[in-house]
Amino acid sequence: MFEGKEMRQVLCQFLDETMANDPKVVVIDADLAKANGTFNLRNKYPDRAIDVGIAEQNMASIAAGMASCGYKPFILSFTPFATRRICDQIAISICYAKQNVKIIGTDPGISAEFNGGTHMSMEDIGVLRSIPNLVIFEPVDAVQLYKSLPVILEYNGPVYIRMFRKVADPIFGDNYNFDLFKADIVKEGTDVTLLASGIMVKEALKASEILKNEGINVEIINVHTIKPLDEETILNSLRKTKACVVLENHNLIGGLYSAVSELLVEKLPMRITKIGVKDRFGEVGKMPYLKEVMGMTTEDVVEATKKAISYK
């Protein structure tokens, strides 16, 4: 269905289809419409595809105002500019006021590659997870993104979509059923649970093939919604396997690892291992290089998994 398609193309296909049928849907960019793929929407919907220039705070404030009048705004930028740069507007104008604004941050974490440390957001989930009334969602592939967008549009409230921008490794087929508030059991297993999000789901799958040859049966859960966390699916899996690794393309402070740790310390105390960015800024490089630098390779996952099992 989406073979070879970039995530931004899938997003724009949905927005185009939706704007054609719903005059209340609005897209607001901040000088990155070409990079995020929404530029051509201006020709078809010149009054509803808006570019505010390099003025992200205004983008968020305009969206909040339009939402208060019944519109359904989607705001887009690179992840650091869609989150930390407009944090106050997200907190007060959007979330405090419970406005129906969808915030899309593209190329999170190391997926920013060549834009360097200033354009790499390792902290966006940590910054936003503490803001009430906000759902945080990270689609794993094009199929999940496309199936999630109608659900997110219908959800009446603020949602942050942390989205890979280019071609993502396929995880799901066309028959995939999406539930915003239920994590996906991608692979069932009995020995250890790998809780992963975004680009790290593929690393979990690759590691599971290596571990399978060593007699280790891995369960993999795609935790696409980091807030609110699907506690039931996670706890059921960990009660079964009694071992856990958390994998995320984010700082290990404040993101999925922190959310899982907060859950387990209250409801299922256990020692777990983790893969992610170790409290540092990013740097320029292709993703394979950055994964190696950050300790996020398949081999790192294999090692962390064996360590988690040793804690049983």
Cite the ranges covered by each PLM segment:
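Thiamine diphosphate
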Residues: M1-R162, V167-A168, ...
